[in-house]
């Protein structure tokens, strides 16, 4: 039985070692989710080589010409798969009635749940599922990204089991709701801040993620900040060998 107590503000983002006992990890996750909704996981089991290869794949893709990337624009796909250029997203929702927030300074490539064109979910044109777009000049990108997607999906299943334990539920409690999840790999590039950037224009504005759980691999540049229960911003510095985990709106509700 879990008794409710008001959350208190975290002073840092905890690192949770997944090699520890499930009960101990679940207890740490419970506290982290109440205080920030964010935590790192270490000893997660994904090979460092696989993660490094995915970062290299992303760098290679974003170094393609703009014409080559625009040929894979996500708007031309039946799903949300493909390239999203700079200027299409504006995440900061603060006071939109009186303030026009600048667009985010980032470009992205989305890999959705890869289904055949004749799959029923593709036929229903649900944009979270469908045939992915891949650049012809990077033949290895598809297999590498799908391997990474499968590995991270497995880690996500482990996180869901620990979240269930943290709520005194059976470890498989979430499984019926995640038989076919929206398992998206999103590669993001944040270019250097241009000299003509608008006031308060940054890579990604303040926001919450809409899904269940986000698993984020960071490079060594940094920039991510997390707001705690008191409204203070904490720096989520890059930590080699970890993923940053955060609860999305779906799980928080």
Question: Could you say what each language-model-derived stretch is?
Answer:
Residues 1-253:
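Peripheral, non-catalytic segments flanking oxidoreductase cores
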């Amino acid at each position: 039985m879990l008794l409710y107590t008001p959350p208190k503000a975290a002073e840092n983002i905890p690192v949770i070692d997944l090699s520890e006992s499930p009960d101990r990890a679940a207890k740490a996750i419970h506290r982290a989710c109440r205080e920030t909704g964010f935590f790192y996981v270490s000893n997660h089991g994904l090979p460092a080589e696989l993660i490094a290869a995915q970062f290299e794949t992303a760098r290679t893709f974003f170094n393609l010409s703009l014409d080559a990337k625009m040929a894979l624009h996500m708007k031309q796909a039946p799903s949300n798969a493909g390239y999203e250029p700079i200027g299409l997203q504006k995440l900061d929702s603060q006071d939109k009635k009186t303030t026009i927030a600048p667009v985010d300074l980032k470009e992205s490539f989305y890999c959705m749940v890869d289904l055949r064109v004749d799959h029923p979910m593709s036929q229903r044109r649900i944009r979270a599922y469908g045939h992915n777009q891949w650049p012809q000049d990077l033949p290895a990108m598809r297999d590498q990204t799908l391997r990474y997607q499968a590995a991270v999906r497995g880690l996500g299943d482990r996180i869901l089991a620990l979240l269930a334990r943290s709520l005194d539920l059976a470890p498989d409690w979430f499984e019926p709701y995640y038989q076919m999840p929206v398992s998206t790999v999103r590669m993001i590039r944040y270019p250097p801040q241009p000299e003509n950037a608008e006031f308060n224009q940054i890579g990604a504005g303040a926001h919450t993620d809409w899904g269940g759980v986000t698993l984020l691999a960071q490079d060594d540049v940094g920039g991510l900040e997390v707001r705690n229960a008191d409204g203070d911003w904490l720096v989520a510095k890059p930590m080699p060998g970890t993923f940053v985990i955060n609860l999305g709106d779906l799980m928080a509700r």
